[in-house]
Amino acid sequence: MKTIHVSVVTPDGPVYEDDVEMVSVKAKSGELGILPGHIRLVAPLEISAARLKKGGKTQYIAVSGGFLEVRPDKVTILAQAAERAEDIDVLRAKARKSGRTPLQSQQDDIDFKRAELALKRAMNRLSVAEMK
């Protein structure tokens, strides 16, 4: 079966690199499924799970936003943060998830947005960690 090369990169360095059969991500415009030979594309990503299918198995990577660049033979995900399901510290993610209090008080709009994004990232990480 044909494959496409995938690189997931963060400011801290590469997180994942391999040849896969299909890449699925959630872009700001909606879900995208990328197969080998896909047309060129650049899209902003949501905080979500990237799904990488290879050999009948699916690997999950928690992606905290960023951008997707697609070429016919390569997909690059440039993310602010990304973690493979097996690398996620579930206790740390649960601690972040329990930080819902700033969302309830809404004292400062900037703090609210930061807390909201931190909560989304934590929930995404927990969701991906459960997919191991």
Curated annotation (Swiss-Prot):
Membrane topology: Peripheral membrane protein
InterPro entries reported in the protein's UniProt record: ATP_F1_dsu/esu_C_sf, ATP_synth_F1_dsu/esu, ATP_synth_F1_dsu/esu_N, ATP_synth_F1_esu_C, ATPsynth_dsu/esu_N
GO molecular function terms noted in the UniProt entry: ATP binding; proton-transporting ATP synthase activity, rotational mechanism
Source domain of life: Bacteria
Subunit structure of this chain's protein: F-type ATPases have 2 components, CF(1) - the catalytic core - and CF(0) - the membrane proton channel. CF(1) has five subunits: alpha(3), beta(3), gamma(1), delta(1), epsilon(1). CF(0) has three main subunits: a, b and c.
Protein function: Produces ATP from ADP in the presence of a proton gradient across the membrane.
Protein name: ATP synthase epsilon chain
